[in-house]
Amino acid sequence: MPHIKLFIPGPTEVRPEILDAQAAWMIGHRMPECTELISSIRPKLRQVFQTEQQVLISASTGSGLMEAAIRNCVGKKVLNCVNGAFSERWHEIVVGNAKDNEVLAVEWGQPILPEQVTERLASGEFDAICLTHNETSTGVTNPIPELVQAVRQSPNGDQIMILVDAVSSLAGADIRFDEWDLDVLLTSTQKAFALPPGLAFAAVSNRAMEKAKTIPDRGWYFDFLTLEKYLLKDQTPSTTVVSLMYALDKQLDDILAEGLEARFARHLAMRDRTIEWGKAHGFEVFAAAGYESPTVTCFANNLHIDISGLNKFLRTRGMIMSNGYGSKLKNVTFRIAHMGDLQMSDMEELFAAMDEYLAENLD
């Protein structure tokens, strides 16, 4: 199969060196070699999450750890903050786990604002809140530090579990778990980590670990306490994705060698260039001004281009970008990912190909 360079918001482009790292000889997950591998990974993960607390490792998707966060941290009632398809998934998971909840919904393309959270938490009946840092469907980054401040200042705010989905932003955006006072911050490998899918990670606060001890029916596979028990021994409760763990170890080395500050700056520069390109052609940014994602830009299809036709053309040039997500935004928007290990030269290659298509197909 020919290589198609991915400018989609996951799975993302994976470098050959990372693919090669998976080709190491197989080992058993209870062998000392696997323990050594996990021991190498753990401190580097904490650096990327910017935390001194635990970062759990799960052989699952990010959605799996979203479910884990709900099962381990919600005892009374949870507020689901929805401004797109993936924040809506928080609500679906909450309902699927029969947790009492309310929804704070805003127009897609808009951020969740602190005053909205303050108003909804005023009743004092919530013990958790679900937030999405980077709404992949709309290209909106929610103002998490300001939202945390609103939560902590609400009734019983110091006891409210702040659960944050950073699946499409962590390792591409500056997210400070300890400094921001979060309780669960989760992500997975196939987005800004620029790895194949198959692993997910969650930084979990000491406060959240204590809360989990009070929650019945946490299950087993996604039980934070079980995951932590094995993690402290540099092990996993069940067979992990060993080949992907090799790739993770290599990629963490490379991420830290680049430097987190430099990595975040590269993502912002690619974001700014993408917006510049789109505006030069007359496309409107779908995200509200000031809340544009550093990892994926969503454009309104206000010029009514044939997005499927554009992607068909891009495939002839060895690349692909993304249509709008789901029935609500498909063909109404399109998305260009600029995350992971993509470089500015990759973006320019994409824009040159898109320029070629638009020159022939725009009236």
Please tell me what each predicted stretch does.
Residues 1, 332-363:
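PLP-dependent enzyme catalytic core of the Aspartate aminotransferase-like
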Residues 52-79, 83, 87-91:
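Conserved beta-loop-alpha segment that forms the PLP phosphate-binding cup at the N-terminus of a helix
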Residues 178-190:
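Conserved active-site segment immediately N-terminal to the catalytic lysine
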Residues 13-14, 190-276:
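Active-site C-terminal subdomain of aminotransferase-like
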Residues 112-171:
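Active-site phosphate-binding strand-loop segment of PLP-dependent enzymes
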Residues 284-314:
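Conserved PLP-binding catalytic core of the aspartate aminotransferase-like
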Residues 2-57:
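A glycine-/small-polar-enriched, mobile loop at the entrance of the PLP active site in fold-type I
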